[in-house]
Each structure stands twice: as structure tokens, then as C-alpha cells.
Amino acid sequence: MVLAGRGMPGTKECLICLTALLLAAAAAAMINGVLDAKLDARMARLHRRVASLERIGAQRATVAAAGMLFAALALSITFLPRLTTALILLAIFSYTPLYTLWFKRRSPWGVVPGGIPGALPVLVGASAVSGTISSAPLILFLVMLLWQPPHFWALALKHQDDYRRAGVPTLPLVRGEAYTKVCIFVFAALLLPASLALWFTGACSARFAIEALCLGFFNLFSCYLYLVKNRRFQRAFQASIFYLLGLLSAVIIDICSRP
């Protein structure tokens, strides 16, 4: 929203958009939990999610998800541009039927198209502010698409036994650890030119470019340190979160500090 509006958005539109996004995301997560219940039950790290769903019940969870989705769409249709509503619907559709029921269960590369719903909130926020989608939010959308696969693969490396028991064909299980680590490095490297495109197109300043470079090299070094040298996959997962938070913060500070 900051990038598209070239500054902090209005309080009202920001709250409405964030509320609609949170409701839609919560609804999608609950539906995902219901659809993946049998898979989750085989994974030790998800025992709390399974226990929570058992206490609530699949039917109640589905009804609650439908209610939250209705509320999200009602807010969006009433107060936000039509494009924003369409993008919210696209995010839900690409996550629930496409990723959860298709890509995740059939391909080790499913996380790549599965990153679309995770990146679409960037365009949702941009369209809520301007009613259109300009080049700068599209670049940030690309950054989010490139960031998500290596972020997930680090987690998949750590929890290989869980995914094996669940029968989910993750990249480490299908192609091996070494191949997965190479893919993580490739995607981490691609984040450098993708983030610098915000400076190259004039959306952000040279100061941001320096910060993006530093963060990008930090991300690559973290991949080497935690994937190759020490095999501490959880740390690699956490470092990627720090990278993204740093990059998004740099964008906001750069835009909002301009005279």
C-alpha cells in the first residue's frame, strides 16, 4: 500500500483492507486445515493444529471459515475497488483448491505456483490504494514469489521425516538434499536483481538499493552458513524471515522518508 500510494495510506482504507485480508487469510487457513487433516495427523510438528481441529470439529471450522470469507468479501465489495475483491478471490482460489488439493500433493515444485496466494496480498494492498496495479507493486509481487520457495524448502529439509510419513512429495524427498540446497541458493540469488529492480525503475532510491544489496548478501551468506556449513535448517528458515522483514521495512522507510 505504501509503495503504490507513494506514502502512508489513509487510516480507514488501511484498516478495511487489512481486516478483509486477515479474515480471508484466516478462512483459507481453516479450510486448508480441514482439507489437510489426514496429512497433518501424520506430521509430528502439526500435532497442535490437529488437536485444535478435533476440539472444534471439521463442520464448525468450515462454517466459521465460510463466515469469515463472507465478511471479508462484504467489506471488500462495499468499501474497496472491484479489482481488490477479484484479487482476494484469486488468492483464496489459488491457495485452497489449486495448491492444497493439487500442486502440494502431486509435484515437488508445487510450492512455486503455491507462492502466488502468498504474494497476492501485495497486489491486494496496491489495488486498494490506487484501483490499479503499477509496475512497482508487480516487482514486489515478484520478490514475494521468489522468496517463498527457498523459505519453505528450508523447512522441508528440517522436517523430511514428517513429509515422508504424510506422503507429500517435497523437493528434498524427491530430488535430495544437495539438489534442494542448490535451488535455495538460486532463488536467493534471484532475489538480488528482483529487489534492485525497485531502484532501477525509480520506485525506490539509491539508499534502498544499498540496503537491498546488504540484505541480499546476508541472505546468501545465511544460506551458506546454515545449509552447507552447519546444516541448521531452522536457522536458515528464520534468517529468510529476517531478510524479508528487513527488505519490506526498507521499502516503507525509503518511501515515507522522502520529502
From Swiss-Prot:
The answer, when asked if Protein transport is one of the entry's keywords, is no
Catalytic activity reads:
heme b + (2E,6E)-farnesyl diphosphate + H2O = Fe(II)-heme o + diphosphate
Top EC group: transferase
Which positions, given as ranges, span the membrane? 15-35, 61-81, 83-103, 109-129, 137-157, 182-202, 208-228, 236-256
InterPro entries per record? Protohaem_IX_farnesylTrfase, UbiA_prenyltransferase, UbiA_sf
Q: So which residues are the signal peptide here?
A: none
Q: Give, as in the UniProt entry, the pathway in which the protein acts.
A: Porphyrin-containing compound metabolism; heme O biosynthesis; heme O from protoheme: step 1/1
User: Where is the protein found, in the record's own terms?
Assistant: Cell inner membrane
Q: What is its EC number?
A: 2.5.1.141
Could you provide one GO biological process annotation from this protein's UniProt record? heme O biosynthetic process
Arranged from A to Z, the UniProt key words for this protein are: Cell inner membrane, Cell membrane, Heme biosynthesis, Membrane, Transferase, Transmembrane, Transmembrane helix
- Entry-linked HAMAP family: CyoE_CtaB
Question: What does the UniProt function comment say about this protein?
Answer: Converts heme B (protoheme IX) to heme O by substitution of the vinyl group on carbon 2 of heme B porphyrin ring with a hydroxyethyl farnesyl side group.
- Comment field (misc): Carbon 2 of the heme B porphyrin ring is defined according to the Fischer nomenclature.
| Family according to the record | Belongs to the UbiA prenyltransferase family. Protoheme IX farnesyltransferase subfamily.
- What is the protein name stated in its UniProt record? Protoheme IX farnesyltransferase
Please name the source species: Geotalea uraniireducens (strain Rf4)
Taxonomic path: Bacteria, Pseudomonadati, Thermodesulfobacteriota, Desulfuromonadia, Geobacterales
Name of the coding gene: ctaB
